[in-house]
Amino acid sequence: MSTSARRRLMRDFKRMQTDPPAGVSASPVADNVMTWNAVIIGPADTPFEDGTFRLVMHFEEQYPNKPPGVKFISQMFHPNVYGTGELCLDILQNRWSPTYDVAAILTSIQSLLNDPNTSSPANVEASNLYRDNRKEYIKRVRETVEKSWEE
């Protein structure tokens, strides 16, 4: 069945193949364009550098009018990532726009890695360390980077 959501997702996939943003990749799982696997490489010159972080994206038929559900599968220690892997990111909630595509979502998440929003933390411990003990925060982040290589 061809729906506008599926057509849009196929356009998003084509863009990811022809004009991939640096440090991110994504593609639909076999036989289901509504679920995607994605990878974000930790940005250079940040504590997340060289990490390979896996995510899953779930789209509903209302996409692009409704944002996808996005969740880290890789362990992530970050102020805006819940223990479940779900993200607290404004563009995936109240600041969503149908103009955002998969590439824009993933690059926004990649930017969030080194520029967390500590005013509304999903992980209070990570937020407190980021604010009050940056050395320990970086140590914990580097541990998740090393774990990302094993996955």
From Swiss-Prot:
Residues making up the signal peptide according to the UniProt record: none
Active-site residues from the entry: 88
A molecular-function term among this protein's GO annotations: ubiquitin conjugating enzyme activity
Pfam family name, one: UQ_con
Gene Ontology biological-process annotations: chromatin organization; DNA repair; proteasome-mediated ubiquitin-dependent protein catabolic process; protein polyubiquitination; sporulation resulting in formation of a cellular spore
Metabolic or biological pathway: Protein modification; protein ubiquitination
Transmembrane portions of the chain: none
Superkingdom to which the source organism belongs: Eukaryota
SMART domains found in the cross-reference section: UBCc
Region (Disordered): 1-26
The enzyme's E.C. designation: 2.3.2.23
Catalytic activity: S-ubiquitinyl-[E1 ubiquitin-activating enzyme]-L-cysteine + [E2 ubiquitin-conjugating enzyme]-L-cysteine = [E1 ubiquitin-activating enzyme]-L-cysteine + S-ubiquitinyl-[E2 ubiquitin-conjugating enzyme]-L-cysteine
InterPro entries, per the entry: Ub_conjugating_enzyme (IPR050113), UBQ-conjugat_E2_core (IPR000608), UBQ-conjugating_AS (IPR023313), UBQ-conjugating_enzyme/RWD (IPR016135)
Keywords: ATP-binding, Chromatin regulator, Cytoplasm, DNA damage, DNA repair, Nucleotide-binding, Nucleus, Sporulation, Transcription, Transcription regulation, Transferase, Ubl conjugation pathway
Family annotation (CDD domains): UBCc_UBE2A_2B
Every UBC core domain range: 4-150
Localization: Cytoplasm; Nucleus
A GO CC term attached to the entry: HULC complex
Record carries keyword DNA-binding: no
Summary of the function given for this chain in its UniProt record: Catalyzes the covalent attachment of ubiquitin to other proteins. Plays a role in transcription regulation by catalyzing the monoubiquitination of histone H2B to form H2BK123ub1. H2BK123ub1 gives a specific tag for epigenetic transcriptional activation and is also a prerequisite for H3K4me and H3K79me formation. Also involved in postreplication repair of UV-damaged DNA, in N-end rule-dependent protein degradation and in sporulation.
Family: Belongs to the ubiquitin-conjugating enzyme family.
Listed name of the protein: Ubiquitin-conjugating enzyme E2 2
Native source organism of the sequence: Emericella nidulans (strain FGSC A4 / ATCC 38163 / CBS 112.46 / NRRL 194 / M139) (Aspergillus nidulans)
Organism lineage string: Eukaryota, Fungi, Dikarya, Ascomycota, Pezizomycotina
GN (gene name): uvsJ
